[in-house]
């Protein structure tokens, strides 16, 4: 990891602890998300000019090695913000890494650990996997991947905030508790490992969670609803700015 980027992430972590942010930046660049997720699809960038790319996804589905068949290309195109050609490229890359057509959690963790070798990304990858696994069947299909990627790369602020809320709502009950936020925060700090400079305080995750709830738990009932979450994020420039760190760890 580039030293300057590490220092930048460290600074953002410190800012997040003081502002209660740490979810998504309204004006942040999309390169980091795209680069990380495209690493899961190593053949996607290298074959864009190959004639084989022009083959339809429907033809690819006939291959016996693919056990999970994705939805019709036209339906995925309608449900996402990708073009038909982009979906073809993404599907080839996905299938190259995952011939079965789905990614289980262990494989997802192995892939994600390559992004943060200096720390332990296991727990955070678990939470991220569950955010992509929208039907909660223990596997991320091509459809799951595309729908999540479409929001992260090309979604509106509202869509991204909804996606981020789902990530922090670990038990998917429609609320974010202090315990859930603390679990996510600890997982992120574990993932960053010893690469941060200056070294973050041991109680930084807990301090951040307390600040987060002071800003977002409007009725002081100990949980944050989706409405409280979105309203607070959109009204607080500090929160929106510090949300940029989320792109660096996605």
Curated annotation (Swiss-Prot):
Ca(2+) 3 binds at residues 217, 219, 221, 228. GO terms for cellular component: cytoplasm; cytosol; endoplasmic reticulum; peroxisome; plasma membrane; voltage-gated potassium channel complex. PROSITE patterns: EF_HAND_1, EF_HAND_2. Residues 237-250 are annotated as: Interaction with KCND2. Residues 61-117, 120-155, 156-191, 204-239 form the EF-hand domain. Keywords: Calcium, Cell membrane, Cytoplasm, Endoplasmic reticulum, Ion channel, Ion transport, Membrane, Metal-binding, Peroxisome, Phosphoprotein, Potassium, Potassium channel, Potassium transport, Repeat, Transport, Voltage-gated channel. InterPro entries: EF-hand-dom_pair, EF_Hand_1_Ca_BS, EF_hand_dom, Recoverin. It holds the Pfam family EF-hand_8. One of its GO terms (biological process) is regulation of signal transduction. Ca(2+) 1 binds at residues 133, 135, 137, 144. One of its GO terms (molecular function) is potassium channel activity. It is found in: Cell membrane; Cytoplasm; Peroxisome. Gene3D superfamilies: EF-hand. Predominantly expressed in brain. Ca(2+) 2 binds at residues 169, 171, 173, 175, 180. PANTHER family: CALCIUM BINDING PROTEINS, KV CHANNEL-INTERACTING PROTEIN 4. Component of heteromultimeric potassium channels. Identified in potassium channel complexes containing KCND1, KCND2, KCND3, KCNIP1, KCNIP2, KCNIP3, KCNIP4, DPP6 and DPP10. Interacts with KCND2. Interacts with KCND3. Interacts with the C-terminus of PSEN2 and probably PSEN1. The KIS (K-channel inactivation suppressor) domain is required for converting A-type Kv4 current to a slowly inactivating delayed rectifier potassium current. This is Kv channel-interacting protein 4. It comes from Homo sapiens. The gene is KCNIP4.
């Amino acid at each position: 990891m580039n030293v300057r980027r590490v220092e930048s992430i460290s600074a953002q972590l410190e800012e997040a602890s003081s502002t209660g942010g740490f979810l998504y930046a309204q004006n942040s660049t999309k390169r980091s998300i795209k680069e990380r997720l495209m690493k899961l699809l190593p053949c996607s960038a290298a074959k864009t000019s190959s004639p084989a790319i022009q083959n339809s996804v429907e033809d690819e589905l006939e291959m016996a090695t693919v056990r999970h068949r994705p939805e019709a290309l036209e339906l995925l195109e309608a449900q996402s913000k990708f073009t038909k050609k982009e979906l073809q490229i993404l599907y080839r890359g996905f299938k190259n890494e995952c011939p079965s057509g789905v990614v289980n959690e262990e494989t997802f963790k192995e892939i994600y650990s390559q992004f943060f070798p200096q720390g332990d990304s296991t727990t955070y990858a678990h939470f991220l996997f569950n955010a992509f696994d929208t039907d909660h069947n223990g596997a991320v299909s091509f459809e799951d991947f595309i729908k999540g990627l479409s929001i992260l790369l090309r979604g509106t602020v509202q869509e991204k905030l909804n996606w981020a809320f789902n990530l922090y709502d670990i038990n998917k009950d429609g609320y974010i508790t202090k315990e859930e936020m603390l679990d996510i925060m600890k997982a992120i700090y574990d993932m960053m490992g010893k690469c941060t400079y200056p070294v973050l305080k041991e109680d930084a995750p807990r301090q951040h969670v307390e600040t987060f709830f002071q800003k977002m738990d409007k009725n002081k009932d100990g949980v944050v609803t989706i409405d409280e979450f979105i309203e607070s994020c959109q009204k607080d420039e500090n929160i929106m700015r510090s949300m940029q760190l989320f792109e660096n760890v996605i």
